[in-house]
Amino acid sequence: MQVSVAEISGILKKQIAEYGKEAEVSEVGEVIAVGDGIARAYGLDNVMAGEMVEFEDGTQGMALNLEEDNVGIVIFGEGLAIKEGTTVKRTGRIVDVPVGKGLLGRVTDGLGNPIDDKGPLETTERRLAEVKAPGIIPRKSVHEPLHTGIKALDGLVPIGRGQRELIIGDRQTGKTAVAIDTIINQKRTHETDSPVYCIYVAIGQKRSTVAQVVQTLEENGAMAYTTVVAATASDPAPMQFLSAYTGCAMGEYYRDNGMHALIVYDDLSKQATAYRQMSLILRRPPGREAYPGDVFYIHSRLLERAAKMNDEHGGGSLTALPIIETQDGDVSAYIPTNVISITDGQIFLETDLFYSGIRPAISVGLSVSRVGGSAQVKATKQVAGTLRLDLAQYREMAAFAQFGSDLDATTQKLLHRGKRLMELLKQAQYAPLSMEEQVVSIFAGTRGFLDVVDADAVVKAELELLKQMHAKHSDLLDTIRTSGKLDADTETKLGVAITAIIKEFLA
């Protein structure tokens, strides 16, 4: 068999022409030390701060410490296969996460990867987890209400869209319950043209607790407009630290596209603890309470991203409800004072109130909303205007009344009314009230219609009142809802209706 030279050269030329494989160039370093979720690598000379890197077993990490001769990398995951000599390469991208409506109804980890066994996420858009907060010019002052469905809050500590309102209190005082109720109450907004989408970020919590929250949201039909980001207690500290920024990026998608979002960080105390752990292992100098010097900045740059945008920028909003856990009611500790100074007000929950049966255990005297007043619905403002003062006078007189039994008629009347108002502010969990229902309840309390009811029966009387209002006077409720205010005519009709219902209740 003879093979011609021309044939061979033709085959070779063809193969050379078709050979077009490009060599993949990547900057690779080598791990020189690893331990406690931190790896130090040598050779990644051009790595950026906050850049994602990948170890040879596929585990991801983030470059945090850029030193002269090595790079400190926090590891996302177990990292059991990472040892001295393991190669690590740059990815060239800063941490980014999936965003969009495809995340609604889903549960993700601290990096936005799904962990709910419902398949891949139906979203293509990604955003950087860490971005600069909007400047002063694109913002607008808070002026639209965000109803929580909780009488004590909407009446006394109103929250507006785009506000940052801190929920602070000891463990087991109902902080998460307030946040979950607020998420459940946003279901009403989905019947209007400006729905509020919700993100719940669980930081350092037990998996069983997160599962319980997801189940509660599903049972109340709230998962349809909610995304849960969970970095649980068993996740590495870097994941717990990053999860808040991941959730925030998801919320910013709605804010920047002219929609409204609510984000709950539960809780930032555990995020600060995770950051302290990372910083100490990275040998950063410790400051007060062993937290690093920039612990204020990690919370301020996160919470400043909650904003109400002006109309030229779409008019969207991102409202933040950060949660802080105190030790024995000490709000003057480092992290609580930091977050109080960053936020636009705080809801203070007290253990004593909780155990005395006043739930939600909101301390009316210590809770404030610095910007929410301008977002409050006029009807609520009209009926709840005197409520804070009435309660303050009641608390003062109640303390005074312990010392003596001889009280004048005015004081006795004040104590009598105050007791009923305290009872009126009680509310069952997962039972948020609409704005018009709250107006009716508070109106009945502050205008003295409930003075004839025994203090123990106030909660029952209120339930009956709302039930009868829906059954017989739904037109009045509709008027309050549509107009958003109480005119003289509506007030008179409401007074007559409430008097009749209470009379029937007492009969």
From Swiss-Prot:
Annotated Gene Ontology cellular component terms: plasma membrane; proton-transporting ATP synthase complex
Name of the featured protein: ATP synthase subunit alpha
Subunit-level organization: F-type ATPases have 2 components, CF(1) - the catalytic core - and CF(0) - the membrane proton channel. CF(1) has five subunits: alpha(3), beta(3), gamma(1), delta(1), epsilon(1). CF(0) has three main subunits: a(1), b(2) and c(9-12). The alpha and beta chains form an alternating ring which encloses part of the gamma chain. CF(1) is attached to CF(0) by a central stalk formed by the gamma and epsilon chains, while a peripheral stalk is formed by the delta and b chains.
GO MF: ADP binding; ATP binding; proton-transporting ATP synthase activity, rotational mechanism
Family: Belongs to the ATPase alpha/beta chains family.
Main location: membrane
Compartments reported by the entry: Cell inner membrane
Keyword hit for Electron transport: no
